[in-house]
Amino acid sequence: MADRLLFSKTGRAKYISHLDLMRTFQRAFARAQIRIKHTEGFNPHPFVSIALPLSVGYSSQCEILEFGLMGDTPYDQVPQRLTAAMPEGIVIHQCYPAQRKLKELASINYIMNFEYSEGRPQEAEPAMQALLNQEIGRAHV
């Protein structure tokens, strides 16, 4: 059975690319002495997978990483130990057993909140409503 981490990627960490982030997690598990499952084959490596990779330069408070916990490390100890081994800007919030397949998370509905330092612009609401009312065309390629 797979396990999941809920983590945030903010500050300077938002400039870490997806592949570098995967390697960062693999190394952090080793530094934190948390045993995880490895891939099978001629060159086994720690198995980690990020549900929906972010583009470089974007930050997030709710990223999901899938891995396989081995040994007797309790779920409640993983966030603290792993955060201590991560670079600045990456914080592990929660570790838990996976309930659904990772591919199912790609079809989740998201709610986005935008904060404006000078209040919400008056023209924003009608513009957003017009955008949401547009019909979406599909192109076959």
List each model region and its residues.
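Active-site-flanking beta-strand signature of metal-NTP-handling nucleotidyl enzymes
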Residues: 2-8, 110-114
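Short, charge-patterned binding micro-sites
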Residues: 38-69, 99-101
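Conserved small/polar residues in nucleotide/adenosyl-binding loops
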Residues: 139-141
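Short, conserved charged micro-motifs
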Residues: 73-81, 117-130
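Ordered, amphipathic secondary-structure segments that act as subunit-interaction surfaces
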Residues: 61-113
